[in-house]
Amino acid sequence: PSRPFVHQLVAEQARRAPEAIAVLFGEQRLSYGELDSQANRLAQRLVELGVGPEVRVAIAMRRSAEIMVAFLAVLKAGGAYVPLDIAYPAERLRYMLEDCGAALVLTQRDVLERLPLPAGLASLAVDDPGEWQDRPEGAPEVDLAEENLAYVIYTSGSTGLPKGVAVSHGPL
């Protein structure tokens, strides 16, 4: 790439200032070192689950420090994240989950219980450390290009149905 990707910039900052605070949410704090290390481990698990370039991963989580780990991990695995507001009605969430073609949903255990997951859609609870925290600490080796998707964000849509807008790594 002509310039580093966002997840590479975070890793660079983690090497430069690992103790500096990267995420502050209420009482939750993550240093750059912790954020990068946790995102690497989760990314390793995501790659094991088939995430890579152009693979979309929905993120349906309460706002928290760990949601930042999830966003970063998807980018490190080469996937494209699709943030979903869990306050939306079940019908709207189901539509977006089906429309975006997500291969996986990252969520939290209590949120998972009320998510309207389409049949066959796999999920991983980020707040279940047994799911991913024993993975290697290094970032997975992923071959990414600027034109690969980074994320898909849904707007309200003029037809009443949410409309997904895809953004690649280049403009990010």
Predicted regions and their residues:
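Carrier-protein-dependent adenylate-forming modules in NRPS/ANL systems
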Residues: 1-172
